[in-house]
Amino acid sequence: MGPILETGVASDTRTNQDSWWRGACLYEVYLRSFQDSDGDGEGDLKGLVSRLVYLAQLGVDGIWITPFFPSPMFDSGYDVADYRQVDPRYGTLDDFLEVVNTAHELGLKVIIDQVYSHSSHLHPWFSMSRSSRDNPKADWYVWADPKPDGSLPNNWLARFGGVAWEWAAERRQYYLHNFLAEQPDLNMHNTKVQDEFLDVMRFWFGLGVDGLRLDVANFFMHDPELRDNPPAKLAETPANPYYMQQRLYDRSRPENLLFLERMRKVAGERMLLAEISCDWQVERMAEYTAPGRLHTAYSFALLAPELDGNVVADAVEQAGHGDSWPTWAFSNHDVIRVASRWNAAGNPGKITMLHALLVCLRGTVIIYQGEELGLGHGNVPRGKLRDPEAIRFWPLDRRRDGARTPFPWDDNPNLGFSRAEEAWLPCDPAHSELSVARQNAVPGSILAKCRDLIALRKASPVLRLGEFEVVDQGRDRLIFRRILEGKRLLCAFNFGGQAINLSRHGLPTVLSGEARGGVLSPGSYLIAEEY
C-alpha cells in the first residue's frame, strides 16, 4: 500500500462499500492474555496468528488488538515508548504483518489501539523534553510553572489517584499526567505533535491496518489556561477522589475537534473508533462523530455496574439521534466481566440472553475475549495484582486484572494459554469448565449459541443497519423493533423474575430464542419477524 496523504475533506458517504464497520461485530483481543507461543507466560502476536481461525469461525467481522508497542508496562502497554515498533515480548513487525495478512485471508479486519493522549516517561521525546526548556521537544508535553509558594499549578487530579502533576527538577516545572506519573500528557495544542501522530497513523495504515481504536480520545487536549475544575455534586464520597471534580478543563476541550478532523482526513474510510470517557457521553459522541470527524465512538453506558431494560433502552435511544453511529460493548479489559456484573455467571440461559441483546442493538458491537464463553470475572489474589489502580485502591477496586486473566483454551496447564510454569496473571481454575475445548464438545453450549447469534446478525441487514424503536421497557423487560425497508424484527428480553406475554405481537417466524405459547420466561429472549 502506498503512502496515505492528508488531503481534502474526508468523505462521509454512509453507503460507501468501505463502511464495513457499520453494524459490524468486532472482537477485542487483550493480547497479553490471549495465547502465548514462546512459553514466557505472556500472550504474543504469533499466538494470536495461531488462533485467528477460531475467531473467524466465531463469525466476527474484525479484531481490535490492545497495545503491542514497546513499553515499560507500568499500565500494561498503555504507556508507549515507541509508536512505530513492536515490543519484543510480543514479537516483531514481521509477526504483526503475519497477523494482518492471515486475518485478511480469513476475512477479518484488523483494528489496533493507539494511545495519543500520553506516552511513556521513557519515550525519547519525553527524555528530551524534560532535559531543559529550550530543546527541540521542550513544548511537546504539558509543562507548567509552580505557584509562587511552590505548590501545584491547579487542582487537577489523576485518574489512578493523587494529583495530576509531577515535579521535574531539570526544568524547575511540573508536567501533567492524567493517569500515572509514568504517563506524561502530550501537548496536542502543538501542531508538530499532531503532525507526528498523523504520520504514525500513516505508518500503520501503510502496513494494512483497517482502523484505529483511539484510547481516551477526549483527553487529547487540556485547557491552556489551566483553570481549576469545579467540585462535583455527589451524594457520598467516592473511594477515588478523582470523581469529586467536574472534568471541565482537563479533558473534552473544544479544541480537540479540529485535531479529530485532521485525523479523519488521513484515515478516510479506514475506521476510527473513539473511546470517550466523560460525564456527558451522548453529547460528546455526537460531537466526535459529526461529519468529517470520527466514524464511531463507544459509550460506557452499557459498562455500568447494573443494567436493566430501562438503562439499555435509554442509552441506545439517546445515542441514536441524527447521523451518529454508536458502538456498544458489555465488557472490556477495564471493567468487571458482564457475566459477573449482571449476576449471570453459571447461568447459561441468561448469558445467552445477554449475547442476543448485544447482537440486536443498533450500532457496531464489540465482544471482549472470553465473553463468548460466558466467563465470570477472574479471581486474582492481592499478591498477584498487576494493575496500578487495583493495587492503590485495594480491596475496593478489582476490575481490571480480573478481566485480564488468561484465556481458557483447554484443560492443559495454564488452561492451554501458555506452557510457562507461571502465566503473567494467574489463570482462574473456575474458567476451565468453560474452556473452548469443553464447549466445542457440547452441542448447544454457550459458545455454540454465541456463534449462532453472531451469524444471525451477520446475515440480517435489519439487525446490522435497521432503525431502533422501543415497544415496551422497564427494569424487568425490554422489547424493541429493528426496522429496515419495511422489514421488522421484534426483539424481546426478560430481565426479571416473572413471565412476559408476547402473544399480542404476533410472531409468525421465530429466528432465535423461544416464547412458548407467546410467553417469555425469566432470563430468556426472543428474536422474531413481525408483520
State each model region's role.
Residues G2-R202, G206, F219-W280, F407:
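Acidic/aromatic-lined carbohydrate-recognition and catalytic surfaces
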Residues R516-Y531:
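C-terminal beta-strand-rich structural cap/linker in extracellular carbohydrate-active enzymes
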